[in-house]
Amino acid sequence: MATDQTVLRHIKELADEEHRLYERGKLTDEEKARLKAINVALDQYWDLLRQRRAKREFGQNPDEAEIRSPGIVEKYEN
């Protein structure tokens, strides 16, 4: 079961990895693919955190929040 703290910790780990990749400058194809995967995962975890906070705000159980598929969270940006 994820808590807000574990979600935030995972977001920080992903963001740190993202920054390390950007600092390298020119990326290999594998690193570019990893960067894209990190960005999708970050979107998913930020969405999960928003869901948890919204459920809590409206008196629902935040533990019922679930990670949504990339197809769903990526559509928010479009």
State each model region's role:
Residues 1-78:
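Extended, charge-rich alpha-helical interface modules
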